[in-house]
């Protein structure tokens, strides 16, 4: 999907760009209530995908995602180098690891708030997602 974005698009790249890509690809008005930046005790999760009440009879999962973006310059790698690296190798890069840890900490708080609000009806899966430029995604389940 990122291949449609050009080098000039890097100028405005940030986590909002990544969230919009996910919203575009995952949006399903028939299955999910998509909630971008929902207020959770005065903090804001990036994306919550909550199964619609009338679709709860299916084994669909609810999702909570926190997005981060790190530029190629910040990881001191070229696009070609990043494309050749394994996911675990990318996750170990200091800039990526820091963002994964930050997203993880936020997700734990958001998850607790969502569970306290909705209770046992949620089948919540939580993911921190870091985009390394427009080249690769690194994710971690919480």
Predicted regions: what is each one?
Residues 1-142:
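Structural signature of nuclease core domains in nucleic-acid processing machines
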């Amino acid at each position: 999907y990122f291949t449609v974005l050009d080098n000039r698009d890097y100028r405005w790249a940030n986590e909002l760009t990544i969230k919009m890509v996910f919203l575009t690809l995952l949006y399903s008005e028939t299955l999910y209530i998509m909630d971008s930046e929902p207020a959770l005790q005065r903090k804001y999760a990036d994306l919550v995908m909550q199964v619609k009440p009338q679709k709860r009879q299916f084994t669909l999962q609810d999702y909570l995602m926190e997005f981060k973006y790190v530029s190629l310059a910040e990881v001191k790698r070229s696009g070609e180098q990043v494309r050749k690296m394994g996911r675990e190798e990318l996750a170990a890069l200091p800039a990526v690891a820091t963002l994964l840890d930050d997203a993880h900490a936020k997700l734990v708080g958001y998850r607790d708030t969502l569970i306290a609000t909705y209770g046992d009806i949620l089948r919540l899966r939580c993911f921190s997602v870091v985009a390394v430029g427009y080249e690769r995604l690194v994710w971690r389940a919480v």
